[in-house]
Amino acid sequence: MGKIIGIDLGTTNSCVAVMDGDKPRVIENAEGERTTPSIIAYTQDNEVLVGQPAKRQAVTNPKNTLFAIKRLIGRRFEDQEVQRDVNIMPFQIIKADNGDAWVDVKGDKLAPPQISAEVLKKMKKTAEDFLGETVTEAVITVPAYFNDAQRQATKDAGRIAGLEVKRIINEPTAAALAYGLDKGKGNQTIAVYDLGGGTFDLSIIEIDEVGGEKTFEVLATNGDTHLGGEDFDNRVINYLVDEFKKEQGVDLRNDPLAMQRLKEAGEKAKIELSSAQQTDVNLPYITADATGPKHLNIKLTRAKLEALVEDLVARSMEPVKVALSDAGLSVSQIDDVILVGGQTRMPLVQQKVAEFFGKEPRKDVNPDEAVAVGAAVQGGVLAGNVTDVLLLDVTPLSLGIETMGGVMTTLIEKNTTIPTKKSQVFSTAEDNQSAVTIHVLQGERKQASANKSLGQFNLEGINPAPRGMPQIEVTFDIDADGIIHVSAKDKGTGKEQQITIKASSGLSDEEIQQMVRDAEANAEADRKFEELVQARNQADALVHSTRKQLTEAGDKLSADDKAPIEKAVNELEAAAKGEDKAEIEAKIQALIQVSEKLMQAAQQQAQADAGAQQAQGNNGGDDVVDAEFEEVKDNK
C-alpha cells in the first residue's frame, strides 16, 4: 500500500507532509520551500503556473493570476461574502449556470475545485519527487466551519487532481494532532485558535490518554469562513490607496497593475510590522498622469496597522466565546492555547488571545506547518502505520429539514461527534398527500430560509390518508468526512428514497470526470512540452558546436564540403523554433550525418595539435625533467 500524504490546502499557502517512519515530515517543494503559495496563473501561451512562479508574474498578469480561491469554493455567486470579493479581486468572478461562483480566465469558465486542483497537483508532485513513487491517496484539511457544500467541493478538487481523498479533516483538529502527538502523558483540554489566510476557526479539544492510546475529542468548534489574512491585507491596501489619493489626487483602484503591486507591498508591510515598529511602503512609478509619473511613498507604523484591523481581531473573538459556551467550559479550564495560521504571528492577535484566555499561547507549534503535519498523522492512522491515535471530530453546524410554516426542525445538533446517525418521524401536512419534499438545511436559525440549503429530494407513492397519519421516517447519516447522507422512508408502504447530499448546485459527476480528463490531458501536454524543450536544447547545443567547428576547420574543408553542413545547420535552427519535436529530431540526425567530414577535420586538427605539443615538450631538454623528478623524491 502506498503512502497517504497529508495536505493543508490553504487560502494563501499550502503545505504537504507525510509519515517518514514514525515521524511526520514536511516536504520541500521544487523551489526548496516548505510552503507553496496557493496562487495559480494562466499565461498568454496557455501555460499553468502554480506557487512561487505564479506569484512572481502576478504584477504583469493580474487578471489571469488567481489567489484566495478557497474563499469561493462551494459558494453561490449571490452569497454576500462572494459579492464582497467580486468588487476587490483583480480577476473576474462570474455566476456559473448552476448559480455557483466561478472564475472567467481569458474566456474560459473555471470552477473553484478545478483551480484548487492545480495546487493539489503541485502538492502531489512535491510528495512524489520526495518519495520516489506515485501518490494516489491523501488526507486534505478544511476549515472546521466549512459547510457540506465546501467539503464536497474540496473532495472534488482532490479527484480532479488525481487523488483519492481518504479523509477530510478539520484544520484545528489536525493542528491538535500535530501538537499532542509527542506531548507527555496526562489529559488536557486545549483551544486551537486558527487564523489563516482566508478563514478562522476555534476548536476546543480534549486530549486523553488511556492505555497508551491518545484520543483527540473535539468538544466544540466555531468560526468564520470569510475572515483571515486576506482581509487584513485589504485594510492595508485600502489605507495606502486612500493616502495616495489624498496626496496625488489619483485613485489607483481602477488600475489593476498598480493594485497588484500594492497587494504585494501591503502584504510585505504587514509581515514586517510583526517584528518592526514601522516600515516604508515605497513603490516608484506606481502610475502616471498628464503631469508625469507618480511615486508612492507612505510610512506605516505598527500602531496604525493595529488601528486598521482591530475590529477584525475583535470579530475573531466572538466564535471563541460561542465555542467555549457550547463546550460548557470556562476560560480557566483551558490548559493550553495553540496558535495556527500565518496571521497569528501578528503581535496584536497574540496579545488579544492571551488577554482572553489569561495565559500566553504556546510557541512550540509551527503555525504554517502544523495542519499539514496533523493531516499526515491522520494519513498514517488510515494506512495502519499509526495505531495509538483516535480522532473524534464533530459536525460544525446543525442539520435538519424544513417543516410546515418554513421552520427548520433540527435532527443533528452542532458539535455532535461524527460519524453519527439520527432518525425522526414526520408526517404529511395535507389530506391525501401522495408525495413529500425533503428539504435539507444546515445552520443555526429557526427560519428555514435563513439557513444554508443543501439540497432537496421527493418521496413519492405515499398511500392517500388524512393529514398527520402517514409516518415518514427521515434519517441523517454523517460520515467521518462530515459529508451528509439523507434518506426518507414511508413506514406504511416501505418505500424509501435516499441521496448523498450534493451541494444544491456543485459539480455533477460528469463535470468532475471531464475535469479529471482535462487534467490528465494537461499532464500529457506538459510531458510533450518538456520533451519538445529537451529536443530544442539538444538542437541549440548541436548548432553551436557545429558552427564553432566550422570556424575552427577554416580552409581544411572546401566550400563544397561546408555548404551542405551550413544548410543543415540553418534547417535545424529553423526547426528548433517550431513546435514539431519529430522534425527537430530528424534535422538533428540529418546534421550529424552531413557533418562526418567536419568531424574528421576536427579530429585531424586535434591530433595535429597534440603532436605539436608533444614535440615541443621533447625539445624542452631531459635534464630539467630529471631534476624535477629528483626534487620530488628528495621532498618525500
UniProtKB/Swiss-Prot annotation:
Name the record gives this protein: Chaperone protein DnaK
Keywords of this entry: ATP-binding, Chaperone, Nucleotide-binding, Phosphoprotein, Stress response
Region listing for Disordered, in residue ranges: 599-636
Family: Belongs to the heat shock protein 70 family.
Stored Pfam families: HSP70
Gene expressing this chain: dnaK
Keyword ATP-binding: yes
Single GO molecular function: ATP-dependent protein folding chaperone
Gene3D superfamilies, per database record: 1.20.1270.10, 3.30.420.40, Actin, Chain A, domain 4 (3.90.640.10), Substrate Binding Domain Of DNAk, Chain A, domain 1 (2.60.34.10)
Induction, per UniProt: By stress conditions e.g. heat shock.
Stored HAMAP family: DnaK (MF_00332)
Source organism of this protein record: Mannheimia succiniciproducens (strain KCTC 0769BP / MBEL55E)
Modified residues (Phosphothreonine): T199
Cited PANTHER family: HEAT SHOCK PROTEIN 70KDA
Coiled coil: none
Biased composition (Low complexity): 600-617
